[in-house]
Curated annotation (Swiss-Prot):
Pfam families: Cytochrom_B559. It is found in: Cellular thylakoid membrane. This is Cytochrome b559 subunit beta. With its partner (PsbE) binds heme. PSII binds additional chlorophylls, carotenoids and specific lipids. It comes from Trichormus variabilis (strain ATCC 29413 / PCC 7937). The gene is psbF.
Length: 45
């Protein structure tokens, strides 16, 4: 990290990685189901 000519070029961090896919395949249904369960608490029978 001593050479300062790659300030706008981070080392090798692309946005769409396997980690990104793994996080979002877990996080998106989790948020969806939490919202659905939370909204089901307020449905009157």
């Amino acid at each position: 990290m001593t050479s300062g000519n790659n300030i706008n070029q981070p080392v090798t961090y692309p946005i769409f990685t396997v980690r990104w896919l793994a996080v979002h395949t877990l996080a998106v249904p989790t948020v969806f189901f939490l919202g659905a369960i939370a909204s089901m608490q307020f449905i009157q029978r």
